[in-house]
Amino acid sequence: MLKEISPAPFGHFEMASPDEGADALRTIVLRAPGIEVHVSPFGATITRILVPDRDGVVADVALGYDDLESYDSAVDRPYFGAVVGRVANRIANARFEVRDENGSVVTRSDALVANNGPHCLHGGTRGFDRHWWAVASRSEDGTRCRLTRVSPDKEEGFPGACAAAVEYGVRADAVSGGACLHTTMTATVDAACPVNLAQHTYFNLAGHGASASDGENKRVDATAHVLRVDASRVAVVDRSCIPTGVLMDVKGTPFDFTAPRAIGASMPPVERPDDPGGFDHNFALNGAFPPESAASAEGAAKGAAETDVSLATDSLKLKRRRSLRVAAEAFEPRSGRRMVLECDAPGVQLYTGNFLNGQKGKGGAVYGKHAGFCLETQHFPDCVNQPKFESCVLSPGETYEHRMVHTFFAE
């Protein structure tokens, strides 16, 4: 079972005591009025998010496991609650090469670990999600913690060392009346390398196990949630979910969540026997791009079916901090729970748990297809190989930063 870490000075912090063995999964518990979040240093993983419904009944709305062995499985990898990297999402053909304006190679790798067919997914077989992170600090009031790890040169085939940090914090928002989970991810490198970290929590706002009927209550899965995404375009992908470089206007398509819409009423049609159905698509967030891309937004507004545009920016613009803005919000009618997601990333991947297939989760819950959904804020998939997309290549002396806020309400 998960074990709460009792308050102790960091530096005297033990991940697992000898009598508990290597399979112990301890968690840091963060608390603020209206919210409790459990974080495991293994994978910097969010294992629980407890928030009340409209009647004040508290439930855990994050899918996950009770034991370390399940989180560390090499066979079954849903990435429940983990920070994924060094590069989230897919890198086509597990290779990349980046050249500067003079044609000189900035960085390259032909030896990334291919763990999704021929492609590299979420950093490889043992990405950031399958390593212990050090607990660098925890606030005395129990509302914040900071986790760090150093990914060595050539880990999963990536060039150079990458020092990463994740800070989680919780607070009550007196202005909105909601309860907030703040996440900030940062990284530096000693050699030019793509960096694109994402937080991979699966949500079910009716409760993590609500997708299985209990005989009294109707099952509630991802399809029952009402979703709005502030994106008028979505990245077109091939059959292996690699972007083609084209952004499609969502108007009149299953991807149009510009107004609140039930996920189940919007599922794209299944076109192939090997298509699992559901969403696994990256949305281009409105207002995320610099003025150069304004023409693309204008083209989409005119109703163009597909807009082949460049979202590439130079290094200075890439490192310029964006403001937080609302990217998406989800509402679950039975519980009355609403979640608003703010971020500073250019895109958000909507994934509806298409490959969940009966994983045994916390408290005996069984997670079938569409048991939960992810809203993974990030750079575009395969952007390191897509010259029309904003680059995620980080150089020595630069700092990568990715911020998001999840605010929970009951109404």
How should each PLM-predicted stretch be described?
Residues 2-411:
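An exposed, glycine/acidic-rich loop-and-rim segment of catalytic or binding clefts
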